[in-house]
Amino acid sequence: MDGEEHQIDGDEVNNHENKLNEKKKSWGKLYRPDSFIIEAGQTPTNTGRRSLMSWRTTMSLAFQSLGVVYGDIGTSPLYVYASTFTDGINDKDDVVGVLSLIIYTITLVALLKYVFIVLQANDNGEGGTFALYSLICRYAKMGLIPNQEPEDVELSNYTLELPTTQLRRAHMIKEKLENSKFAKIILFLVTIMGTSMVIGDGILTPSISVLSAVSGIKSLGQNTVVGVSVAILIVLFAFQRFGTDKVGFSFAPIILVWFTFLIGIGLFNLFKHDITVLKALNPLYIIYYFRRTGRQGWISLGGVFLCITGTEAMFADLGHFSVRAVQISFSCVAYPALVTIYCGQAAYLTKHTYNVSNTFYDSIPDPLYWPTFVVAVAASIIASQAMISGAFSVISQSLRMGCFPRVKVVHTSAKYEGQVYIPEINYLLMLACIAVTLAFRTTEKIGHAYGIAVVTVMVITTLMVTLIMLVIWKTNIVWIAIFLVVFGSIEMLYLSSVMYKFTSGGYLPLTITVVLMAMMAIWQYVHVLKYRYELREKISRENAIQMATSPDVNRVPGIGLFYTELVNGITPLFSHYISNLSSVHSVFVLISIKTLPVNRVTSSERFFFRYVGPKDSGMFRCVVRYGYKEDIEEPDEFERHFVYYLKEFIHHEHFMSGGGGEVDETDKEEEPNAETTVVPSSNYVPSSGRIGSAHSSSSDKIRSGRVVQVQSVEDQTELVEKAREKGMVYLMGETEITAEKESSLFKKFIVNHAYNFLKKNCREGDKALAIPRSKLLKVGMTYEL
């Protein structure tokens, strides 16, 4: 390179690609490379935290999952038959027909669909509606904010498959999705609908589970049952702050005992009353049931469906555990226990058709009644944990994707990533659960609402997994059709039945969903408008350099981090800042925090630098990339990493330019075309103290408020180190968002009132970014959107 900085343009890269691999003709279409795609730092392979998980850890997580995931589906036997036969049992054969429905619903939906298919659609070990959404966004540009960069696909956690001739169908669908704004909006709305329904489950599950268990004490009046239930709910939500791992280890033994009781009680009733109910294993009895009951049988499906409530928690809570752990615990413990207890209850009902309203407790052998009752109450409390944990997970994911107002997310386990607790949401859920319990008072009414929420999430999951099969897995079209037709038909049949009870309580989850969707949609809508405004009003690089190097602008010692959401271009806030303060730090960095559709980013891939102006200007751009499951580091740790990788970037650029001791004058007037991801030669990152070595010659680099021309890489890194010793200042825009005067009344209401109300009542941006208040300087500006 002879001491010259090597400039890379798009044509050179395209020619280089063609020479490297003529066969991969679809590469350009899939990745749309620009001039950064070849020179972007190649990252080490990351096989993911789940792949190397030991057998002991897997079994430990499987045990924990009993206490978090299966409480909901495990306590369904408390109320399924009572919710199905609301008008009593007219024919003993109806019991066999319903049992057959229950067995095949659990087998097909819970075991086959979720345990063996849906769990495979995880995002590097994370589950839930937003995990599916992020997975789709990673393979197709379906995000509503246009901040994707080609270098993002170089992250090890993207794990994209290289183009092959087998990708034609997937590529065609991907192209259509990327070019359709309507498809992007629909996918987003479906995603936040599923997320809202999961949060709604977190409200309804505790209410119905606790009420159903406490009602087992026949001597208690309804008012007392409701009062005791409310007290239990308060204790449950107060316990959440201790974290999922502690909750899991505390609750898992109880659920294990509960499942043991279910198996024992089920076998007891089978052998004592009527073992012939096992003929329900023949699916023909489902057909016979509908022939006899007709419309009433269809209505009863709303009660049958309750046997799989909580199934979605297996996927939503996946980030707390692992795929293998959930598969083991469900297949070996939960599934056999559930099938056994439902068979035993059916055997009891064939002899005691009049006891359907309290089937579970009446079928318990007398010596086991009180021990079972105590465990049932404990299990019902634990049942609530599944959807509470799921609600925390999906809110955390949606927050990192910019689709939820800022709230505090606490990671409760240093050992298991993905275990989170959100204080504000926890107490809001508690208040909502108490309100539902006091308003509905019985499990029958809550059950009507509960079914709608659960089955809607399942339908959404089926549709999104079908899309993943088409675009990502590239599954044979026959298997895709079978998956969609079989599970889609089952779930739509159940949905039609539960919607029949809309006026009897079914309106509640839809009301909750509408409110949450409106909140998330408003937040995302204004967030996109704000981003597009900054993109439209951004200032050019030349103007920014001219402003910063103007004789009227002083360069003060230190590092200034100017936060902007733009990953390309310079925010108009920069011009506003310069015109008002007339000073720029000796090392000035335009920094963007970007959340990618992966669950985590390794530290060596996190910082993405480039020069804004000439190399002696001390001006840089930095994109700091996080996964949607990560929190921003503490300030001291962030500053150490930032300075370390900034100096690595300077060394890298020096090496790429040929290692010359001086920078050619012509290069100082041009912005290099290539952004560079810093990949240090080792994984070492200093944990404390100074980073790098400082030379005495740097003492004169900053004089009289001006920057002296830097000639060597040592001088540049020394300047950065000296600036760090002077301290970092965090500069943030304090923008006031208003709608344009000519905007419609609806837009004015959304922007001026709804969004600003949410903004005032959520966490401030500097708190979300973990910025120390003592180092914060805010720049006020009004945006008219």
Curated annotation (Swiss-Prot):
**What does the record say about its membrane topology?**
Multi-pass membrane protein
GO CC term (a single one):
plasma membrane
Taxonomic superkingdom: Eukaryota
Up-regulation conditions: Induced in both roots and shoots by potassium starvation. Down-regulated by salt stress in roots.
Where is there biased composition of kind Acidic residues? 662-673
Transmembrane spans: 61-81, 98-118, 185-205, 219-239, 248-268, 298-318, 328-348, 368-388, 420-440, 452-472, 477-497, 502-522
Give its localization.
Cell membrane
Query: What does UniProt say on post-translational modification here?
Result: Phosphorylated at the N-terminus (amino acids 1-95) by CIPK23.
Biased composition regions of type Polar residues, renumbered to the chain: 674-686
Tissue specificity here reads:
Predominantly expressed in the roots.
Query: A Pfam family in this protein?
Result: K_trans
Glycosylation site positions: 355
Key words of the record: Cell membrane, Glycoprotein, Ion transport, Membrane, Phosphoprotein, Potassium, Potassium transport, Transmembrane, Transmembrane helix, Transport
| Topology Cytoplasmic: residue spans | 1-60, 119-184, 240-247, 319-327, 389-419, 473-476, 523-785
**Family annotation (InterPro entries):** K+_transporter, K_trans_C, K_trans_N
Q: So which stretches are on the Extracellular side?
A: 82-97, 206-218, 269-297, 349-367, 441-451, 498-501
Q: Does the keyword Protease apply?
A: no
Where is this protein primarily located? membrane
Output one GO BP term.
potassium ion import across plasma membrane
Q: Name one GO molecular function term.
A: potassium:sodium symporter activity
Q: Where is the composition biased (Low complexity)?
A: 687-697
Similarity-based family = Belongs to the HAK/KUP transporter (TC 2.A.72.3) family.
Tell me the subunit arrangement: Interacts with ILK1.
Its job = High-affinity potassium transporter. Can also transport rubidium and cesium. Is essential with AKT1 for high-affinity potassium uptake in roots during seedling establishment and postgermination growth under low potassium conditions. Mediates potassium uptake by plant roots in response to low potassium conditions, by a calcium-, CBL-, and CIPK-dependent pathway. Positively regulated by the calcium sensors calcineurin B-like genes CBL1, CBL8, CBL9 and CBL10, and by phosphorylation by CIPK23.
- Protein name in the entry: Potassium transporter 5
Species in which this protein is naturally found? Arabidopsis thaliana
